[in-house]
C-alpha cells in the first residue's frame, strides 16, 4: 500500500532543517546589572511547532491537497521558549521597587502570559494595547486578527509619568513575521519618558532604551514615528 503524503509529514521533514537553535551555552544571555522602572517584553512563545497554511510556497509538494500548504512556524524564525523556560529568566533582579511591565501576547498564550508576569514578581492589571493587524489568520474558533500588550505592575506605578492620552487600539497593517508596530514602544516612551527602560527579547536598538536579546543591532536609532491608525488600510 502506498504511503499517503500528509501535511504533517511534510512539516516534520522541514521542521528539523528549519528550526532555529539558541547559539548560547546558557538559555539566556546575561541580564544588565541595573534596575528598571519600565520593562517591555515580547517573549518568544513556543507554539509546539504549529503549522501555518497559506496559498504560497512549496508548490512541488502541494500536489493532491485541496489548498496549498505553507510550511512555517515561529520556531523557524527565532529560538522559541516554553513557559517554564521563560520563568527561569531572572527579571526580578532588574526590576525597581516600583516597576511596570508591558508584555506582548496572543489569544492562545494569554493565560501563560499572566502566569509569566506573576512569576517575575508582577501583578496583572489590564490590556494596554490591542493591535488590529488589518488582516486575519485561520483560527480554531474565530479568524485571528489581533495581538495584545498586557500591563503588569510591581509596587506603585513608577513616576514621573508623561502622556495620559495614549490610545489602546492600534489599527496597523502587520509587517514581517513577529514584527511589532513601533507605535507601541513609542506610546510607552511617551507615557514614561524620563524613566529607565529596557526592552527584553529586543530586535531593535532604540534611543532612550536599554535592550536585551539575541538579535540586537549595534547602532542606536530613533523610534520611527507611526500613527495609531494605518493610513494605508
From Swiss-Prot:
Domain of life: Bacteria
Gene3D superfamilies from the UniProt entry: Vaccinia Virus protein VP39
Keyword Transferase belongs to the record: yes
Residue pairs linked by disulfide bridges in the UniProt entry: none
UniProt keyword annotation of S-adenosyl-L-methionine present: yes
EC category: transferase
Keywords tagged on the record: DNA-binding, Methyltransferase, Restriction system, S-adenosyl-L-methionine, Transferase
Annotated catalysed reactions: a 2'-deoxyadenosine in DNA + S-adenosyl-L-methionine = an N(6)-methyl-2'-deoxyadenosine in DNA + S-adenosyl-L-homocysteine + H(+)
E.C. code: 2.1.1.72
GO biological process, one term: DNA restriction-modification system
Entry GO MF terms: DNA binding; site-specific DNA-methyltransferase (adenine-specific) activity
Family statement: Belongs to the MT-A70-like family.
Name of protein: Type II methyltransferase M.MunI
Species, as recorded: Mycoplasma sp
